[in-house]
Amino acid sequence: MTPAELKRLYHIIKVQLEYGLDELLPDHQLTKAPLLMRKSLFWIKNQHPEKPLGERLRLALQELGPVWIKFGQMMSTRRDLFPPHIADPLALLQDQVAPFDGELAKQQMEKALGGPLENWFTEFDIKPLASASIAQVHTARLKDTNQEVVLKVIRPDIRPVIDSDLKLMHRMARIVAGAMPEARRLKPVEVVREYEKTLLDELDLRREAANAIQLRRNFEGSEELYVPEVFPDFSNETVMVSERIYGIQVSDIEGLEANGTNMKLLAERGVSVFFTQVFRDSFFHADMHPGNVFVKPEHPENPMWIGLDCGIVGTLNSEDKRYLAENFLAFFNRDYRRVAELHVDSGWVPADTNVDEFEFAIRIVCEPIFAKPLCEISFGHVLLNLFNTARRFNMEVQPQLVLLQKTLLYVEGLGRQLYPQLDLWETAKPFLEEWMMNQVGPQALVNSIKDRAPFWAEKLPELPELLYDSLKQGKAMNQRMDLLYQGYRQSKRQQATGKFLFGVGATLVVCSAILVDNAYEQLSMASGIAGVTFWLLSWRAYRQ
């Protein structure tokens, strides 16, 4: 490690000890190295003993800076790995840091766009509208259309900082996994690797721009979700230009109520938007925390969600969607046997899983949940309990399902914050049942034919020629198979002949040796010559 890395590592350990995070390392499971290191830093004491562990962890990550803040935010979504007293405080982490100089931001943008901003924009505000750990946002107007826009720019020199801290994270994860057998269950190395991929993806604004364009296209003309327009001509790896929006933050309940918003409809539309993204589009916004969701102030009786920051999205394939929908329906019908079978059929758990034991484990965990009224049941926590139970049966982490679970918890939390009586199951069940009918019912056949009609219309004129070519190739294939079979039979005959000749030759050579011992020299010589001759004939048969 370089001196700079050692200095940073010492600072990280010092902050962790000042917040008493060594409580996370139980003494009876530690190897000698971590114990020795802790004792060697005896002068660093817990400065916040009155605060609970989860809050101390949150404050420590906040102090360590943006890379660790985002890591904590990701940890808060992994409720399959971390208990509520750890995950809940981490969900409160705020990704807010001091802005960097606006003139420097302008220089970064001009470098990325290849010219002065005045060529394309007017009224550029040197004061940032918002600032986060990865990027900063400024406002301006498009010169050609006078439309208000926001320019998002990646912080300069952020990449070396991220690379350095990620390298330390990987080292620390390997140390923790090696020092504590119990920690291996949390898969620290895999968690850091997953975080690294997510964080590095956020450094490329082309990805976010493409995601926003796709999501906007999916909801074009919708009354439920609005995604601001992105201007790809002015967007690249480090700069993204998009439409400026004015809205009420979804967590501003007083502001929404003062605007006369239909809170029940707004909450139900949040659920509808989620299930539409997942089951209709297989492409969903996976970072829908309150900071990224606004509500249009116009037409409060017919409220519309606004989705920002599409840096993290999730996708599901058709098989995952079908299994997920069937799981939800089976769960709320309390058909735990079907839930267990679906997990095996989907490959989420090993094929040799004992279905009876798996069913019983699911029943024990989930039956108490359904003792409550349906309107009080958390859809997200049902999914969380299911995944936690499945992990005991060696279910591998499914990244797409982790993102789905996180998003569902966000949407459900927002929905019940807006309208506490929200019955998510009542809202979602008709959607799921209709989707299942469209997938496996008569309508599915109609949809399949409709989707494939252009392909068959294009191929229909070619069918006679394709049929003729197929018959012709089939005949040629039969002829080749006959020739191969004849060659195979000939080869087997030659091998049999070779084995026979070799056996005769071996017998004659043995006889020659016996005759020499009994003083029949002439017969011995004749027998030996004959044996060698048969061996040569055998070798020739094999060669052919």
UniProtKB/Swiss-Prot annotation:
Segments crossing the lipid bilayer: 496-516, 519-539
GO MF annotation terms: ATP binding; protein kinase activity
The protein's annotated pathway: Cofactor biosynthesis; ubiquinone biosynthesis [regulation]
Membrane-topology descriptor: Multi-pass membrane protein
Active site, renumbered: D287 (proton acceptor)
Domain Protein kinase: 123-501
CDD domains registered for this protein in UniProt: UbiB
GO biological processes: regulation of ubiquinone biosynthetic process; ubiquinone biosynthetic process
Keywords, ordered alphabetically: ATP-binding, Cell inner membrane, Cell membrane, Kinase, Membrane, Nucleotide-binding, Transferase, Transmembrane, Transmembrane helix, Ubiquinone biosynthesis
InterPro entries to which the protein is assigned, alphabetical: ABC1_dom, Kinase-like_dom_sf, UbiB, UbiB_bact, UbiB_kinase
This protein's name: Probable protein kinase UbiB
Organism: Vibrio parahaemolyticus serotype O3:K6 (strain RIMD 2210633)
